[in-house]
């Protein structure tokens, strides 16, 4: 009897959660908008965290587009994140493949990925050593300032 009660409770909770998820949208925040612009400031030294950040950015882009609002995103990566973007680095191959896959998914959506040249120099990384689809810029702080001045919302991700 106790097991049956647990199963029923779990089923009800699951059904309730799926109905809540279907009802959620961003209509209030996005009302009256036809487009949005954001620059994501990414700083992490952990590859799984970077993958989570890339996934959140991808999903946010998709959700925005599904609500008929065009999204223009820039992902600005600096600091120790740069070391995670190097093609021929030591580490778990499967983890690196997932990172590359997420980079490709972001690129396919037209999301601009930038690597800080200041950090490249600091860590001794050449721009050509980065994964494909990542643009090297002089200094990501200038990108953050410039894009905000152009009306892009700053989204810290670390």
Spans of model-derived segments:
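Short acidic/glycine-rich loop or secondary-structure boundary segments that cap or lie
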Residues: 48-50, 83-86
């Amino acid at each position: 009897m106790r097991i049956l009660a647990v199963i029923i409770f779990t089923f009800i909770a699951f059904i309730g959660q799926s109905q809540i998820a279907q009802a959620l949208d961003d209509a209030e925040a996005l009302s009256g908008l036809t487009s949005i612009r954001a620059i994501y400031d990414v700083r992490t030294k952990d590859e799984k965290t970077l993958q989570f950040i890339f996934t959140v950015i991808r999903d946010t882009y998709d959700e925005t587009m599904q609500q008929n609002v065009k999204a223009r995103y820039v992902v600005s990566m600096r600091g120790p994140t740069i070391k995670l973007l190097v093609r021929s680095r030591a580490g778990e191959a499967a983890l690196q493949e997932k990172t590359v896959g997420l980079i490709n998914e972001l690129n396919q959506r037209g999301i601009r990925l930038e690597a800080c040249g200041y950090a490249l120099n600091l860590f001794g990384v050449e721009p050509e050593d980065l994964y494909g689809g990542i643009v090297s810029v002089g200094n990501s702080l200038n990108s953050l300032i410039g894009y905000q001045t152009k009306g892009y919302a700053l989204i810290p991700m670390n």
